[in-house]
């Protein structure tokens, strides 16, 4: 069990993650940009770390800032919430490289699910029911037929 988790998100999702962490007896750390200073998620968490300017690319999407914030406050893990860095395989790898735990799928799983064909193959292999698709269809033949 972790003692402290940094939540790499804002708003309602960060508040919900913080509430769950509190129920589990785990300290929560919010991150915030200049635009979110004093926002609700920064007040419901046990701590808050500033991660950059108002633009998301300078804060919530900046993996280096998020990881540095986790290291600075002594968090053992990072929960990405959804959006922002949650589906970024390189971020998941960077978190692991920083000797922190990424709470979510592995980088390999993120990559596989990001590729529709690979995700479909994995689902079929796992016995998940899937709708029929256009496997093996000649895309060029379809284009020619549409243009005829």
Predicted regions and their residues:
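N-terminal beta-alpha lobe that positions the nucleotide/phosphoryl donor
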Residues: 1-148
């Amino acid at each position: 069990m972790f003692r402290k988790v940094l939540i790499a998100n804002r708003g309602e999702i960060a508040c919900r993650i913080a509430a769950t962490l509190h129920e589990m007896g785990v300290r929560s750390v919010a991150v915030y940009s200049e635009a979110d200073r004093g926002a609700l998620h920064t007040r419901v968490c046990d701590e808050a770390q500033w991660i950059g300017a108002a633009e998301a690319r300078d804060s919530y999407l900046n993996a280096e800032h998020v990881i540095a914030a986790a290291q600075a406050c002594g968090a053992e893990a990072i929960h990405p919430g959804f959006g922002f860095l949650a589906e970024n395989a390189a971020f998941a790898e960077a978190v692991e490289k920083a000797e922190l735990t990424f709470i979510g799928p592995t980088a390999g799983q993120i990559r596989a699910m990001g590729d529709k064909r690979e995700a479909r193959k994995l689902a079929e292999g796992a016995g998940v029911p899937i709708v029929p698709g256009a496997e093996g269809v000649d895309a060029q033949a379809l284009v020619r037929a549409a243009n005829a």
